[in-house]
UniProtKB/Swiss-Prot annotation:
The keyword Lyase does not apply. It holds the Pfam family Ribosomal_S14. Keywords: Ribonucleoprotein, Ribosomal protein, RNA-binding, rRNA-binding. Part of the 30S ribosomal subunit. Contacts proteins S3 and S10. This is Small ribosomal subunit protein uS14. GO terms for molecular function: rRNA binding; structural constituent of ribosome. Belongs to the universal ribosomal protein uS14 family. Gene3D superfamilies: 1.10.287.1480. GO terms for cellular component: cytoplasm; small ribosomal subunit. Binds 16S rRNA, required for the assembly of 30S particles and may also be responsible for determining the conformation of the 16S rRNA at the A site. It comes from Rippkaea orientalis (strain PCC 8801 / RF-1) (Cyanothece sp. (strain PCC 8801)). InterPro entries: Ribosomal_uS14 (IPR001209), Ribosomal_uS14_bac/plastid (IPR023036), Ribosomal_uS14_CS (IPR018271). GO terms for biological process: translation.
């Protein structure tokens, strides 16, 4: 189980990404549309004024059951450990053990 502080930090990042997504997208679009060098610098400064954690790149996928950041399967939103346990218990519909 991940530390609660790390899980909460990720939740905070998710909230910030959602809050500033429209503003960040508008600034990026304005940056690409700008032709004047000075204007681009000003837009870039405005982008830098946004909180660091509002950037989608700073988010980390975490298992929603345990909070584990590594071994994450996007299709399920689970870490490899939980995926294996739940698949063996039959808690994941459609997941069957491979045999050939």
């Amino acid at each position: 189980m991940a530390k609660k502080s790390m899980i909460e930090r990720e939740k905070k990042r998710a909230r910030l990404v959602e809050k500033y997504a429209a503003k960040r997208e508008a600034l990026k679009e304005a940056f690409h549309q700008a032709e004047d060098y000075e204007e681009k610098i000003e837009i870039h400064r405005q982008l830098q004024q946004l909180p660091r954690n509002s950037s989608p790149n700073r988010r980390r996928n975490r298992c929603w059951a345990t909070g584990r950041p590594r071994g994450y399967y996007r299709d399920f939103g689970l870490s490899r450990n939980v995926l294996r346990e739940w698949a063996h218990e039959g808690l994941l519909p459609g997941v069957v053990k491979s045999s050939w």
